[in-house]
């Protein structure tokens, strides 16, 4: 019997984009291999700005239907501008471009090792320095028997921006939230405030509440970041189970970010921010490991504060987050010029 032939596309016009797909805790990551324009700019924030203003078609083509879906997440690899960086990355989603994404870092750590983007891999861990728009992230990829595995990474300085902030949320009244930064800014509030449970309530109800909180915080709270105004925006709202005091038992949360996008993982940058918040409140100590459970899939990350530092005038911590990513496939996408839906679309 002859070996099966790999599927081949017939002749077509328009560009072709090659990608590798992975997931971390159920949250997808689509990594662009080829076909994307080379972003202009000296710094990674300038490259992010250039892509947003000049090549947003790439995000829409790969994230939106019919090639993606409204909860797809992507990564475009770019040269880093820091000497220590092995790779740089721009993150993309249904609304635009993030500054940090922990689940993507876990996946990209494996990817960088497996695709030879770092020096020869060696056990028990191989270091991968990934420059994100928020700064340099140091990832450590377990490596045994020629196979990459779990990944841990150390965050940029994470801090509590404001605690016990009262915002008026239409339809819900006055709601008290905390705001923290873990590479991106999040609002945190217990789902119990709204009579919901992060693990058992309908996803639609969790999304509606989170979206309302996000819009209210955006309208009523001015954020700032010591390093750049490009970092000073609210990425989303994380609903928690309210179990913030230290425990060996997992604590659950669910993150609704960007344009009501639901994170299937426990949210790496959200775990970072939540650890920083718990440390700020004196609920945990350095090196105390907490386990975080996704309310969407039940997948787990672990996190701990490893050292104190500063971010401008904010007292901050460096947080270590650990997780596992898996490959799901590799694809080539085409854009046929006569296709009226070639640019992508989203259903709401």
Swiss-Prot record:
Homodimer. Its EC number is 4.2.1.77. PANTHER family: TRANS-3-HYDROXY-L-PROLINE DEHYDRATASE. This is Trans-L-3-hydroxyproline dehydratase. In contrast to the T.cruzi proline racemase enzyme, lacks the conserved Cys at position 267 which is replaced by a Thr residue, transforming the racemase activity into dehydratase activity. Keywords: Lyase. Gene3D superfamilies: Diaminopimelate Epimerase, Chain A, domain 1. SUPFAM superfamilies: Diaminopimelate epimerase-like (SSF54506). Pfam families: Pro_racemase (PF05544). Substrate binds at residues 102-103, 263, 268-269. Belongs to the proline racemase family. It is an enzyme of class 4 (lyase). Catalyzes the dehydration of trans-3-hydroxy-L-proline to delta-1-pyrroline-2-carboxylate (Pyr2C). One of its GO terms (molecular function) is trans-L-3-hydroxyproline dehydratase activity. The keyword RNA-binding does not apply. It catalyses: trans-3-hydroxy-L-proline = 1-pyrroline-2-carboxylate + H2O. It comes from Xenopus tropicalis. InterPro entries: Pro_racemase_fam (IPR008794).
